[in-house]
Amino acid sequence: MESFRRFSLLSFIALLAYFAFLASAEHHVHQFVITPTPVKRLCRTHQSITVNGQYPGPTLVVRNGDSLAITVINRARYNISIHWHGIRQLRNPWADGPEYITQCPIRPGQTYTYRFKIEDQEGTLWWHAHSRWLRATVYGALIIYPRLGSPYPFSMPKRDIPILLGEWWDRNPMDVLKQAQFTGAAANVSDAYTINGQPGDLYRCSRAGTIRFPIFPGETVQLRVINAGMNQELFFSVANHQFTVVETDSAYTKPFTTNVIMIGPGQTTNVLLTANQRPGRYYMAARAYNSANAPFDNTTTTAILQYVNAPTRRGRGRGQIAPVFPVLPGFNDTATATAFTNRLRYWKRAPVPQQVDENLFFTVGLGLINCANPNSPRCQGPNGTRFAASMNNMSFVLPRSNSVMQAYYQGTPGIFTTDFPPVPPVQFDYTGNVSRGLWQPIKGTKAYKLKYKSNVQIVLQDTSIVTPENHPMHLHGYQFYVVGSGFGNFNPRTDPARFNLFDPPERNTIGTPPGGWVAIRFVADNPGAWFMHCHIDSHLGWGLAMVFLVENGRGQLQSVQAPPLDLPRC
């Protein structure tokens, strides 16, 4: 009898805790109106595509356990879809967003409501358009706080400052893309980088709009840094101030201090900053980290960290006190970029798979398509070719008549094939002098199937075809553990012995070292069609992508949900 009472009491307490959890979760309803908006930068006004007339778009703030319903109303002249970058979308690929992968795009005049739940995630993520180059101006922060009463693994500051790094073209980005697609050449590089949508003091007609962040002496703030740029890894620093890194891609890290961070497109990094310097004005700045032998935007964007009540003028008639400028690494400082990345560690012992069921090896890199007429205006790449990119020599082509996920769910043939190779079809010296016969990839819409709950390891190997380069690879629907990396060709006999299987960093986007490799592991516990691609949008457009098809497990709770009734049609 006593044991029954004890059991009943424990059950009652558990039930109360469950209802308290339900009561603490909120449902957020938003409306995203996609519309052209006049935006003036670099002395000129452009009709930029925005959300709710804002550039950058609105910041979404939620807690772990909350749910969202975001209705996207497309009043622009382009097809669009929205991706909630880093949200796992468990069993719900219909809300993931990449056009022609998990949904057909939202056409002009149409509406679609993304419905999803935040499940066991917290930290800094973001959202952006996933339709061609619309994400150049259609993006915003997505901040997930812990459940009420849940602690942080570090002393949490009272104030957050979202820092969205972007790129700006002095013309319509869709026209930049259209020109590159026609000529086969590389797209024109951006004309400016931005911090929260503003280029900063170093660009023409930009000083008045420079973002200023007030801070009190002695105050510690958390900077939530997001690289929303299209095509460029960036170094970021604040003059005379140190950062304490505490999170990357919504996963906590063992804290460490640094003067500079390197952040690739798609990645997020949270840092703590304490105002412990002489009261004044200090530039925060971002400039390119460029590991490729290719043109890039070699400008610098700035904002100002301004101590409250600090003097801003030298005296009557003597002008303003110029902000202190940070020392940034050189644009090609791979040593600094690598040293930063190598210091990242998961904040505690990580639940990384110790054994693997799927051992995959993917080459990632550029390529060239030969032209029958090298003098054609459509063949203005190197030596009369067209640029391409591939994984395992397969250059991904988006379908047009249906999305991969819809075709997979409905069993519709002819949209994709499941013969993406698990290893390169031809093995070669990946980082050496590669024969020109291996520079031309094969085009196709190819996917690779994974069994539910299989332990997956992928080695991503950069190649020297065209140029070695840091490729920020993003996997939809998953977080993964970065268990190892190195330069040169991956050695399957010796390199795994150096893997970190204790506290590897957890990410959703990771760069391949230029001329090197990176190894990741994850458990395939989220059924559906999940895009894996380079987050440099030029490379994605050239085909540096593939799709994983993760099969259903057993029963409803291990299977993909039914598609929503308002899912857009092609």
From Swiss-Prot:
Q: Which InterPro entries match?
A: Cu-oxidase-like_N (IPR011707), Cu-oxidase_2nd (IPR001117), Cu-oxidase_C (IPR011706), Cu-oxidase_fam (IPR045087), Cu_oxidase_CS (IPR033138), Cu_oxidase_Cu_BS (IPR002355), Cupredoxin (IPR008972), CuRO_1_LCC (IPR034288)
Q: Which domain of life is it from?
A: Eukaryota
Q: Which reaction does it catalyse?
A: 4 hydroquinone + O2 = 4 benzosemiquinone + 2 H2O
Provide the GO MF annotations for this entry. Answer: copper ion binding; hydroquinone:oxygen oxidoreductase activity
Kindly list the positions annotated as binding Cu cation 1.
H83, H474
Q: Name one GO biological process term.
A: lignin catabolic process
| KW Iron (keyword) present | no
- Pfam families this protein is in? Cu-oxidase, Cu-oxidase_2, Cu-oxidase_3
- What Gene3D superfamilies does the record tag this protein with? Cupredoxins - blue copper proteins (2.60.40.420)
Q: How is the cofactor bound?
A: Binds 4 Cu cations per monomer.
- Entry EC number(s): 1.10.3.2
- Indicate the segments forming the Plastocyanin-like domain, all copies: 33-149, 159-310, 419-554
Chain positions carrying an annotated carbohydrate: N79, N188, N298, N332, N383, N393, N433
Name the cofactor(s): Cu cation
Annotated Cu cation 2 binding sites: H85, H128, H535
Q: Where is the signal peptide?
A: 1-25
* PROSITE patterns assigned: MULTICOPPER_OXIDASE1 (PS00079), MULTICOPPER_OXIDASE2 (PS00080)
Q: Which NCBIfam families match?
A: laccase
Q: What does this protein do?
A: Lignin degradation and detoxification of lignin-derived products.
What is stated as this protein's family in its record? Belongs to the multicopper oxidase family.
| This protein's name | Laccase-3
Please name the taxonomic classification of the source.
Eukaryota, Viridiplantae, Streptophyta, Embryophyta, Tracheophyta
